[in-house]
UniProtKB/Swiss-Prot annotation:
Residues covered by region (Disordered): 30-63
Keyword Transmembrane: yes
Highest taxon above the source species: Eukaryota
Cytoplasmic side: 1-119, 184-200, 249-256
Membrane topology category: Multi-pass membrane protein
Transmembrane segments: 120-140, 163-183, 201-221, 228-248, 257-277
Name of this protein: Protein YIPF1
GO biological process: vesicle-mediated transport
Top-level taxonomy: Eukaryota, Metazoa, Chordata, Craniata, Vertebrata
Length: 306
């Protein structure tokens, strides 16, 4: 066992005395700014784990967390609160549009594309574009149906814009609001149900309407069969997005309640599609168009024979 004297602290002399005793010793000045000290050695495998966390987005800085906290803490009546829902880049919007056009079987649109970051930019402009696409295409369709009639005078129907806006925006906001309230009520009874926020549901409905923009443009074709084929394709694509998104939210509920919810979602979607086609494009004059053209010829033929 060591003696007590061996455990005493020993005071060293100054640097000059030590250098005089050992002139070949290497010296480093820690106050020299040109000297850099390496990092402490890390345990094996720690570098790989840090790189993995960086790729997964788990290694967030304190500044990012602070900014995120400030971003989420704005009151709902301020402009800054709603500004966060328009803070998306072009890649995110295009990726969500692609997801609504090419739904992946068995994949949830909210979990796959929205990822707890819903936006209102895409749904707002999709609905606005769809309103003008339906109104303008409906006017052009009516013009093409009566093209060539001498007694027909084209008058733009501007009221179609307001009607289309009322229908589209009411569907894109009121239906998600009712669905959100229903899911919230059922979630209080069945705790294992998947829950969505109101803005996530609005985001799903908004992006699911994108396919109707090219469909509305193609509805100008004055062929009823073509129009119904187009509406069935649009219904199949957009309806599958809604079903695959909301089925996980209700499948843990009572079987009848779950099926009734999905059927209601699909029926409202069908009602919107068929209603827009019937009101804005499928004009009653199409059925009487051949009679209106042949009637003058028959009158002229009868006059000549007499």
């Amino acid at each position: 066992m060591a003696a007590v004297d061996d455990l005493q602290f020993e005071e060293f002399g100054d640097g000059a005395t030590l250098l005089a005793a050992n002139p070949d010793a290497t010296t480093i000045n820690i106050e020299d700014p040109s000297v850099s000290f390496g990092h402490q050695p890390r345990p094996p495998g720690s570098v790989g784990r840090e790189e993995d966390e960086e790729l997964l987005g788990n290694n967030d800085s304190d500044e990012t967390e602070l900014l995120a906290g400030q971003k989420r803490s704005s009151p709902f009546w301020t402009f800054e609160y709603y500004q966060t829902f328009f803070d998306v880049d072009t890649y995110q919007v295009f990726d969500r549009i692609k997801g609504s056009l090419l739904p992946v079987p068995g994949k949830n649109f909210v979990r796959l594309y929205i990822r707890s970051n819903p936006d209102l930019y895409g749904p707002f402009w999709i609905c606005a574009t769809l309103v003008f696409a339906i109104a303008i295409s409906g006017n052009l369709s009516n013009f093409l149906i009566h093209l060539g009639e001498k007694t027909y005078h084209y008058v733009p129907e501007f009221q179609k814009v307001s009607i289309a806006a009322t229908v589209i925006y009411a569907y894109a906001w009121l239906v998600p609001l009712a669905l959100w309230g229903f899911l919230l009520w059922r979630n209080s009874k069945v705790m294992s149900m998947v829950s969505y926020s109101f803005l996530e549901i609005v985001c799903v409905y908004g992006y699911s309407l994108f396919i109707y923009i090219p469909t509305a443009v193609l509805w100008i074709i004055p062929q009823r069969v073509v129009r119904w084929v187009l509406v069935m394709i649009a219904l199949g694509v957009s309806g599958s997005v809604l079903v695959m998104t909301f089925w996980p939210a209700v499948r843990e509920d009572n079987r009848r309640v779950a099926l009734a919810t999905i059927v209601t979602i699909v029926l409202l979607h069908v009602l919107l599609s068929v209603g827009c086609l019937a009101y804005f494009f499928d004009a009653p004059e199409m059925d009487h168009l051949p009679a209106a053209i042949t009637t003058p010829n028959q009158t002229v033929t009868a006059a000549k024979s007499s």
